[in-house]
Amino acid sequence: MNEIDIRLNQLSYSSLLTLHACPRKFQLDRLQAPREEGDDLSSSVTFAFGHAVGQGIQSAMESKTESQVLMDMFLIWEANLLAENEKQKKSFWSAVIAVQKFMAMRTQGYLEDWELVYIDGKPACELSFLIHMPDGFKLRGFVDAVLRNKLTNEIMVLELKTTSSYAVNSATYKNSAQAIGYSVVLDHLFPELSSYEVLYLIYKTKDKEYEQLQFTKSYFQRALWIRELLLDIEVIKMYEEAGIYPMRGESCYNYFRECEYIYTCMLSTDKLTDSITEEQAQKILQGHDTYQIHITLNDLIVSQLSKGH
């Protein structure tokens, strides 16, 4: 088997979701194939909205003033400031409303027994981690915020989500691999932990209301997660060896929109993508240095065994 393009072995929670839904889309995404541009505006606003709300809530948890919080949101907003996704009720100004609602909840006592964990004098927000897997594969991730109970010293991960749905079903988040991956960060900060809580705080854009879901995660679940991650890597290697990433037609229409590769995915990969340049490869490798927590698969297994799982 030829060496795998470095762009294909840089994994994340979202890229693995794409791999599971449609391997061909995963391949084209990672190799930066050209996309259909029809829905770029709404997609960029949706992406910017989630980041702005997350940043605003993190800043509010740091006890910043409202002016400071809004400035942080403004600085992270990457779409046109006046752009709006009308269908999903997402814009910069609706993000401001979402964060102001959270600040009002805090004033009324929401999470009053919880405080941000600080590491080396910095708040544990947007903590980044990189897991070094076999054959050059890397799994990258971020933790929104780590909280500590002032009374019990219990540790909890705060995970911030937004949705345009009116109803939130717990099954959407209950077995999320993303939340299990957070154990990598908690292992680094609190080696003695045997389980931890994950609090999903979900803002519903159409109702303009928050809903929360809380789950307990154990290190037994992480043992299964490690094995599943290794299986995903083996699947990618198998696709590479076969020279085929299967197309999943059931994923061509999702979230009320056509896949951006709907008219091109059947074409030759060589015609759709360019070979990686030395400059691009170096940029990816240098980007690894920006992650705060690095851990190898061996470290992960040793930690797992020390917890008796």
Task: Set out the residue ranges of the language-model regions.
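A non-catalytic, helix-rich entry segment at domain boundaries
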Residues: A52-L127
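Non-catalytic protein-protein interaction segments used by genome-maintenance enzymes to assemble
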Residues: F47, I119-A179, S183-F190
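Short acidic, Pro/Gly- and aromatic-enriched capping/linker segments at domain boundaries
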Residues: N2-S15
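Hydrophobic/aromatic-lined pockets within catalytic cores
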Residues: Q32, Q58-T65, L147, T162-S165, ...
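Active-site-adjacent bridging/hinge elements
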Residues: P23-L31, L147, N153-E159, I233-K237
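Short small-residue beta-strand/loop micro-motif enriched in glycine and branched aliphatics
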Residues: E36-D39, S165-N169, E211
